[in-house]
Amino acid sequence: MNRLGRLPLPLPPSVCLFCQSRATTPLPPSLQATRSMATARLRRRVARMTLSPDVAKPSVVKKTRGDKERFGPFAGMNQTEARIRDKPRTRSRAAQKRSGEPEEDSQKESPLYKALKMQTALAPIPYGRRAAIKAKIADITSFDQFQLLPVVRNSISSQALPGLVDVTPTPIQRLAIPRLLEEPKTEKKPTKADDDEPQYDQYLLAAETGSGKTLAYLLPVVDAVKREEARDKELEKKEQEEKAREREEKLKNRAFDIEPEIPPLSNAGRPRAIILVPTSELVAQVGVKVKALSHTVKYRSGMISSNLTPRRIKNTLFHPDGIDILVATPHLLASIAKTEPYVLSRVSHLVLDEADSLLDRSFAPTTTEIISKAAPSLRKLILCSATIPRSLDNLLRKRYPDIKRLTTPNLHAIPRRVQLGVVDIEKDPYRGNRSLACADVIWSIGKAGDAESEGPYASYVAPKTKKILVFVNEREEADEVAQFLRSKGIDAQSLSRDSDARKQEEILAEFTEAPPPPTPDEILLAQKQRRHEDAIPFEMPQKTNQDSSRRLANTKVLVTTDLASRGIDTLAVKTVILYHVPHTTIDFIHRLGRLGRMGKRGRGVVLVGKKDRKDVVKEVREGMFRGQALI
């Protein structure tokens, strides 16, 4: 109370009553959902799961003024163009659409590849550049046009590509072999400013699956190894002559004061070239090709992986006669390099096969460590892959800005000779049973006749066994699907990281080695046996088998994960079934890339369910039909 005995009046509140009541009242659910949807942002896909848009674009960095940079008080001096603040702005696309006017300098976007662009899984290379590359390599039609050593050139048809009548280089081989055979004109002298920059040449080989990338880098590497071996022999001969002269002079001057000779450094465990691959299965496959060329070219090669015993790895790498070309996995080679630092002291050529995997998060630290240790003697770094993700492209532009990019016209495309079919598992008779749909497709393919003729002696040769690959997304489902297929009378096996190493080699051998054509002796024996059966007047007793009607004959199925989707040369496979829709178009390319190799035809089948992206499958199928890159 004041002096007059009255109560003071309350002060007016700083916030009105309407605002106070509005703050205490919660928003209705419909408005809350609207507000949350309005503030939500679309998340960008991970860079390692999306392909780069500018694979063939050179790494040229242009300095541009940032949008947030403000002009100072003296920014108007020495200007050739006036910056008028009230300059009329161009109308936005939304305003033009509302007014019904056509957009300026823009073309109507085709609805094709809409879903793939939303995923940003594949990215384009301009088709003008593709046409220029085609015109550039059109004149190269034979391996004789390459500046290879005669012994290397003669070994291509006999060792690298046996059994082929028409031996012609593929597009990536026409691009890569001449560039990789080039010798550096002048060697770089390291300066203080260029200490961090690599002093070796870098190459990126980007080509579609099954295009012969292995032979594209292997032939120049073998050629360089043989040339370097010849140079070393000449230098060694000169050094021995000089040492002999010095020894004679010392003997004349000081007959009793002779210094002990220093033994030369052994070449054991010091390869000239190293090929790194991500898996032990690829080590075996690439190692066989390297070994085949060594029979005629004469060099020492070896392969090491975790599937081999320590004694065999030691005998292969540290052979007293030395080693020229080594095929290995990064983790095993890095562990050996920690205890034996001289392993990487003589490497002149380093190849990263499946570079998108070797420079991913799991392999990047180990691979980078190997490159840095081999850098003092390294002359050429070669990276090759069928898919170039954005993460790899950004890494190359940052770390190797001067890398030479050799890309083929059909990069990020699936060959047109591969047909893609779609099976909706939600319809009758499957009703959502994906395993039942897979078994039904395999039975249909197994019962159907082979489209390719076996030649004039087809009736005298045993029927060809059909090989089918089934890809699943999860490792645990490989065994489950294989067990279900076996219960339906299908000869199915599973292959994953959980499988035994020896079992993996045996299984892959059945699906990677194509059976050779029948020899004349086999044809004559089959003819003789058939004439003998036709001459018997009565019917021969046949083997009775109760389950013969429930078994699918002449068909073998391999249920696997992405373990067999990269680099495995599955020449014997003509059919691939995608049990699940792949997560990205990168997986689409690698899984369907097991087909159409060496110019052969193939067929792919995708099982599509209720929750799968049917729009992505549709656009991939249309892109394959058009023969375009999956953009």
Swiss-Prot record:
Keywords on record: ATP-binding, Helicase, Hydrolase, Mitochondrion, Nucleotide-binding, RNA-binding, Transit peptide
Catalytic reactions on record: ATP + H2O = ADP + phosphate + H(+)
Pfam families: DEAD, Helicase_C
Transit peptide: first to last position: 1-45
Top enzyme category: hydrolase
Motif (Q motif): 141-174
UniProt domain Helicase ATP-binding: residue ranges: 194-406
Domain Helicase C-terminal: 455-631
Family: Belongs to the DEAD box helicase family. MRH4 subfamily.
Domain remark text: The Q motif is unique to and characteristic of the DEAD box family of RNA helicases and controls ATP binding and hydrolysis.
Name of the protein described by the UniProt record: ATP-dependent RNA helicase mrh4, mitochondrial
Organism name: Neosartorya fischeri (strain ATCC 1020 / DSM 3700 / CBS 544.65 / FGSC A1164 / JCM 1740 / NRRL 181 / WB 181)
Taxonomic lineage: Eukaryota, Fungi, Dikarya, Ascomycota, Pezizomycotina
